[in-house]
Structures are given as structure tokens and as C-alpha cells.
Design a protein with these regions (language model features):
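A common structural microfeature
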Residues: 6-8, 55, 72
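Aromatic- and Gly/Pro-rich amphipathic surface segment
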Residues: 29-63
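N-terminal, well-ordered alpha-helical segments
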Residues: 56, 63-66, 96-99, 103
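Catalytic domains of carbohydrate-active enzymes, especially glycoside hydrolases
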Residues: 57-78, 293-297
Length: 453
């Protein structure tokens, strides 16, 4: 398997899921601090107050990354650690933490990729409306300015927003993630618009404040995978992938085109406007000029895929997985072809290099009697998905890199600590770190630039 010589092999994490130190050094509350302390919100009744204590252990954690051969690492910044109230006074201790983190990465030969927003909105801003507020884009631009000025001399790779669909879909439509709202379609559409406008303002700030910056955006979604390689099934899968279905309950919260076309093409998808234009804020057409900023890469978080084919009526038809089809511990179906067709369809539509910002497998890992963590299913998952990604590269899709989610086991949002995605096993009682077998396997993949796949 051949990957470009400058292919970016890496791993990813996010602030709330690993940092801990929730009440230390001036950090302000986030919506996840409040949400996880409410009864019934997290399956194992846990929270991220301590998480894996990365805030205090980042130096040893980064040394572990270097030992494993990691050369690219995507982390996110806790907005409330920088600005406890979301706006106003800057917490210098928070800035110092991220500055030291970046220095440590660079000292260990690791290139930092900074995600500005990975779901942990300052609670003070939620009380002022959160993503429902039209002021959010400017609040986000102000926060981005502070980060850019503090880190931009050393960090040149930024991702504005991680998984906008989950932010809106899980947090504002279904209410299963912070802030736990179940909004009407009108509010969902407006919140999504404010989020994309915030992305655009952040790109403008980064271009103005960070010389030589490279900027991307990281939506998610389950690619529609052709059931067969027939032209009819390929066309059906492509059509379904980008179709906006009108849903007055959740709006366009989970749609890839609704959250990508404005950013990448400068327009909302026409089929979505049929149902949702009535909910967009005044001046939305003018806002598109800000939302649509030139990007250096288009990030994608891909874990699975769904089969589609041309139905007897000529329309796309979903094909269910048969009994016994492999799934991960979260019951997400394993379909490696998603990491072929997703990048291919997305590049055909957006004509921007693709960066796989997340891909990984959840399992209920445990330490064996020999003191090691054996996870052959994760190795097989990665092997299959990376071969599919390599085929996309061979077929002409410009894929810049692959970031495995996640480097560590961590706090997995509403699932708490029972689900483990990491290459590194974490004992949450002792904070011991153990490299899993998959970590050593991925080490060899990175060392050979994928030639051993």
C-alpha cells in the first residue's frame, strides 16, 4: 500500500475528555461540567472533573507519544480555560498551560494541530444564549484572536470546529449531549447557521493573525456506501449522501451537505432550503460571504458507513446489515468502505484535500493476566479502514493524513468511561497508562508509511 511520502499519521484527543483539573487555575465552567453533574445524563454517572488527568500529566503523556513514534497530534483547547466567562478577562494560567503543551510537543518532534472548539462551550455563554445567540460568531472570533496571538508563532495548523452536526444534533435537537436541549427545527437551523458563521469568522481571524496558517473544518457523518460497484448503486449512494431530507423534529441537524455546502461552496443546498429557508435569520445570504472562506483542507470524522443502492423505483434504497454483521461495542457497524467512498464523494463535491481528523474503534478492553492489553479487533479494524483509505489515495483522492481517535482511553461523553477508543489503556483509578497491542501495530504502520498494510 502506497501513501504519499508526506502523509500525516497522527492521533487525536479533546480537552474535556482528557484534561481534568475542572476547577483549577481559574478555569471557568463549561456546559459539559454542568450537564454531567445532572442526574441521568451519563450512563455510568461519571464526569470529566478528573478524566485522565492530562492537565497534570501532559509531559509524560507527550513523551509516551514520542516513544510510540507519533509525529502529528490533534488536541483541542478548553475555551473556558482561556476565558472563564467566555468573553472578557483572559485567564493567563490557562494560556500558559497550552503554551507549555505546544512547546513540549515541539520539543518531542510532534507537530501540533489545534482544534478551537470540541464541544465544551463556556457555561456563561450558554446562559447568554449559546449557539442560539446571534452574538456567538463574534464571541468565537474574539476567543480565536486570543488563541492565535498566543500560539500562532508555533502552531500553524488549526481546525475551527469539530463535528458541528453532533454539537447541534446531540446538544440542541436530541438533548443527549450538553447543553441538553430539545429545540424546534427553527432554532436548530438558526443555531447551525450561527455555528458556521463562527467558523467563517475564526478563519478570517486566523488568516490575519497567523502567518503561514493552514486551516480546516471537521464535520462528521456516515458515508453512504454503494451496495455494489455498479454505476447505478454508486450514483444512488452519492445522491443520498448529499440529500437533505426535511424533518421538522430535528431539522437538518445530522446532514453533511447542510453543514458543508455553505462552508465549502458558499451556498445552502437547494433541497434543504425548500423546508428550512423560512427559519434562517435575516441577512443569511450576506452571511454566506463570511461562512465561505478558503480552506486548506476539509476534515472528516468517519467511523462507519451505510449501504445504499438504486431501488426498484429508481430512488436510493437503504440496505440493512445482515444478522451477525460486525459492530463495535457501541453497536456502530463496521464498514471499511466508508473510508473509501466518503473521501471520494466529498472530494468530488468540494474539490479540497481531505484530512481524516478522526477514525477509530470502541471496545471494552481489559488488562490480561500478562499485564498487557490485547485488542486484535481494533488492529483488524484499523487495517481494513487504512487499506480502504489507501485505495482512495491510489484512485486519485488527495488525502493529506489520518488521525486515529483516540490516543488515550478517555471520558466518552454521555457514555462515560465504559467505552474505550484509545491506543493507550488508562486505569481510571490509578491513572496508569498501558500501550495496547494496537499501539505497537500502528507504530509500525507509521514507521513504514503504510507500506506494511
Amino acid at each position: 500500500m502506497q501513501f504519499p511520502k508526506d502523509f500525516l499519521w497522527g492521533t487525536a484527543t479533546s480537552s474535556y475528555q482528557i484534561e481534568g483539573a475542572a476547577n483549577e487555575d481559574g478555569r471557568g465552567q463549561s456546559i459539559w461540567d454542568v450537564f454531567t453533574h445532572a442526574p441521568g445524563t451519563v450512563k455510568d454517572h461519571s464526569n470529566g472533573d478528573v478524566a485522565i488527568d492530562h492537565y497534570h500529566r501532559f509531559r509524560e503523556d507527550i513523551r509516551l507519544m514520542a516513544k510510540m513514534g507519533i509525529r502529528n497530534y490533534r488536541f483541542s483547547i478548553s475555551w473556558g480555560r482561556i476565558l472563564p466567562d467566555g468573553t472578557g478577562a483572559v485567564n493567563e494560567k490557562g494560556l500558559a498551560f497550552y503554551s507549555e503543551l505546544v512547546d513540549c510537543l515541539l520539543e518531542n518532534g510532534i507537530r501540533p494541530f489545534c482544534t478551537l472548539y470540541n464541544w465544551d462551550l463556556p457555561y456563561a455563554l450558554h446562559l447568554r444564549g449559546g449557539w442560539l445567540s446571534p452574538d456567538m460568531p463574534e464571541w468565537f472570533a474574539n476567543y480565536t484572536t486570543i488563541v492565535a496571538d498566543a500560539l500562532g508563532d508555533r502552531v500553524k495548523d488549526f481546525i475551527t470546529i469539530n463535528e458541528p452536526q453532533c454539537i447541534i444534533g446531540s446538544g440542541y435537537a436530541l438533548g443527549v449531549h450538553a447543553p441538553g436541549l430539545k429545540c424546534c427545527a427553527a432554532d436548530i437551523v438558526r443555531a447551525a447557521h450561527h455555528l458556521m458563521l463562527a467558523h467563517g469568522r475564526a478563519v478570517q481571524v486566523l488568516r490575519a493573525h497567523v502567518p503561514g496558517v493552514r486551516v480546516g473544518y471537521a464535520p462528521c457523518g456516515d458515508p453512504c456506501v454503494p451496495y455494489t460497484n455498479s454505476p447505478e448503486d454508486i450514483a444512488a449512494a452519492r445522491k443520498e449522501y448529499f440529500t437533505v431530507h426535511i424533518d421538522e423534529k430535528v431539522g437538518p441537524a445530522w446532514n453533511i451537505a447542510w453543514f458543508s455546502d455553505p462552508v465549502m461552496l458558499g451556498q445552502y443546498p437547494a433541497d434543504g432550503l425548500v423546508g428550512y429557508e423560512q427559519y434562517l435569520p435575516d441577512g443569511w445570504q450576506e452571511d454566506l460571504k463570511t461562512i465561505h472562506q478558503p480552506l486548506d483542507f476539509y476534515g472528516q470524522n468517519i467511523y462507519q458507513g451505510q449501504w445504499w443502492r438504486r431501488g426498484a423505483d429508481g430512488k436510493p434504497e437503504h440496505v440493512r446489515y445482515p444478522a451477525g454483521h460486525p459492530h463495535n461495542a457501541l453497536e456502530w457497524p463496521i464498514n471499511e468502505d466508508g473510508l473509501y467512498w466518503g473521501p471520494r464523494f466529498l472530494y468530488e463535491r468540494y474539490h479540497t484535500p481531505i484530512l481524516i481528523t478522526e477514525n477509530g474503534m470502541d471496545a471494552h478492553d481489559a488488562v490480561s493476566l500478562d499485564g498487557k492489553v490485547h485488542d486484535p479487533n481494533r488492529q483488524d479494524y484499523m487495517h481494513r479502514y487504512l487499506r480502504a483509505l489507501g485505495q482512495a489515495v491510489a484512485d486519485g483522492v488527495p488525502v493529506l493524513g489520518y488521525f486515529y481517535w483516540s490516543f488515550f482511553d478517555n471520558f466518552e461523553w454521555a457514555h462515560g468511561y465504559q467505552e474505550r477508543f484509545g491506543l493507550v489503556y488508562v486505569n481510571y483509578q490509578t491513572q496508569e497508562r498501558i500501550l495496547k497491542d494496537s499501539a505497537y501495530w500502528y507504530q509500525q504502520v507509521m514507521a513504514t508509511n503504510g507500506e506494511n498494510l
